[in-house]
Design a protein with these regions (language model features):
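N-terminal hydrophobic targeting/anchoring segments and the immediately downstream early-domain regions
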Residues: 1-156, 199, 214-307
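Short, glycine/acidic-enriched loop or turn micro-motifs at the edges of active sites
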Residues: 8-10, 185-188, 209, 283
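Acidic, glycine-rich active-site loops and adjacent beta-strand->loop/helix elements
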Residues: 52, 208-209
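Loop-centered beta-sheet repeat module
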Residues: 155-195, 201-205
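Generic beta-strand/beta-sheet core signal
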Residues: 184, 205-207, 237, 278
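Short, catalytically relevant binding-site loops at active-site mouths
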Residues: 188-189, 209-211, 240-243
Length: 310
């Protein structure tokens, strides 16, 4: 089973370890994702996000560039085992050469500081997908999760605030560049703004089904149908809060069976063609049945048992 995963936060963990003076080897580490585990899991493609937390106090562009630097150094260190991709054809070439493909993405469009020039520079550096937001409203759009807001369970969606004029300009430029617009983390209104103001397929790199787990980070059935009509894809997120519907968030679980349940819902509402994986590995905690990227056979078994056959 060849695996595609649209989202992980491994780059930020590698950068954090370097900053702490305890650098990790990407070949083999204690992270959810490393090269050895990717090979064991039979991965064809892993997307690596340069993750930026606007609330950290760091310069967001510097953070993104430093994580992109980590990505490039990892690729240079293991050229016979993993290689970056810039076009779809690169995936086939890497597979033919026995290499895993790695796609560079950005999680937090606010790192561009509103500059289309920075966006174009990120594309030149190899970024091929970007979320407009993370968990903060920024100069491009509103997010659904409000990091500084009082905790409410389940998280209520933002149906009032969407893309700004600058955000609309970013969507247009991303489409011109063929950089994928990623709507994970985006507010509900922002999602529909993307639907109305874009023409190409977009992605929700790590979002599940709100009908099964009522967190605002998940997609409604109406959203899923709109994405399917456009030829979009959505990545199944392994985070406990986005999979389970327990009244107490601390009781939420992450199991292969729950992931397969969301896959079946995506198939029922939007069709099997839109389903991808978006593990969020190295960006999520809690008890995970699939606790690293080598454990994908557990999901393959669960999909067969649940007759999702994705």
């Amino acid at each position: 089973m060849k695996v595609w995963d649209l989202h992980c936060d491994t780059l930020s963990e590698l950068r954090r370890a370097e900053q702490a003076g305890r650098p990790l080897s990407f070949a083999r580490s204690g992270l959810h994702i490393d090269l050895e585990k990717l090979e064991t899991g039979d991965y064809l493609l892993q997307c690596f996000a340069a993750f930026v937390d606007l609330g950290s106090g760091e310069d967001p562009l510097v953070t993104a560039l430093e994580e992109i630097d980590v990505f490039k150094r990892v690729m240079a260190a293991y050229p016979d085992r993993i290689a970056p991709v810039y076009t779809a054809a690169d995936i086939g070439r890497n597979a033919a050469a026995g290499r895993i493909s790695a796609m560079l993405t950005v999680e937090e469009g606010g790192c561009c500081k509103g500059s289309l020039g920075v966006l174009r520079r990120l594309y030149e550096l190899g970024v091929r997908m970007m979320t407009l937001t993370w968990n903060y409203d920024n100069d491009l759009a509103a997010s659904n999760v409000k990091e500084k807001a009082p905790f409410v369970w389940p998280c209520p969606p933002d149906a009032e605030h969407g893309l700004t004029e600058k955000g609309l300009a970013f969507v247009a430029e991303m489409e011109r560049l063929h950089m994928i617009v990623d709507v994970s983390h985006l507010s509900d209104k922002g999602f529909w703004d993307v639907v109305r103001h874009s023409t190409r397929p977009f992605a929700a790199s790590h979002s599940n089904c709100r009908a099964l787990a009522p967190h605002c980070r998940n997609l409604t059935d109406e959203m899923i149908r709109a994405m399917a009509e456009r030829g979009c894809i959505a990545g199944l997120n392994y985070c406990t809060a986005f999979l389970d519907d327990q009244p107490d968030p601390a009781a939420c679980r992450s199991t292969a069976a729950l992931i397969a349940r969301h896959a079946a819902r995506f198939k029922q509402v939007g069709g099997a063609g839109m389903i991808a994986l978006g593990s969020d590995f190295d960006g999520i905690g809690g008890p995970l049945e699939m606790d690293d990227c080598s454990k994908l056979p557990l999901l393959a078994d669960a999909l067969q048992i649940g007759r999702a056959h994705v």
